[in-house]
Amino acid sequence: MCIRDRYYDLKETDSLAHSTAVQVSREIGRRIVSGNYKPGDLIEDEVSLSERFSVSRSVVRDAVKILVGKGLLEVRRGIGTRVQERTKWGLLDNDVLAWHLSSPPDREFLRQLMEVRLIIEPKAARWACEHGRDKQLAEIEIAQTRMEEEQSSIEDFVIADALFHRAIFRASNNEIMRAMEGLIFSALLSSIRLTNKDPRKNKESILFHRKVADAIIQRDADKAEARMESLLGDAGHRLKKQINTPKK
């Protein structure tokens, strides 16, 4: 399963679109986010796109409407369909976040995602202590145990890591916080592609996660918040080293 599909799986969203228009929109969207189409570029006309994807022109029109709704495209009569500036994209949209995972790592985007995580996740850990039900806290412990069991596998460890953070978000019992979990999944899956290439280093990460889990299970909100900050500080340090490594 590719990393993009892992994102949809974590979000409990079907990565296989049932609508042909959605499938086409996702393919065009991936090309926009990956930079094949750049802001200001005109994409192909309806006829060309319908031939490329072997679909009707009405399907292409519906696909374009989907991308207009996500802020990626604009349609101008007499000019064509143009890619919008990145500042107009719906960056928190589930598909847009997933499309980033299909693209080469965007180091600036990863840096910004980590900054947001540093603001959000320590509070999520605190609220999990304060508002989480016993069953939800048990899910956090289960997820952390799974990380220990999967430490020899890069791919399985990544999923266990994401499930750990998802369990904390959901234990916060804050609807707004839960609505932002897609952002965290994208940040996790994107950054881990760079920082978690050697399974032998998973042991270092497990210790940070174990300390967070212990604090939450003990419902020690101050300690949980501080330990999550330490966990993210370590992750941010490793990510920064990768970001600052010259591209070959």
Language-model region placement:
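C-terminal effector-binding regulatory domain of bacterial HTH transcription factors
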Residues: R4-D14, D222-K248
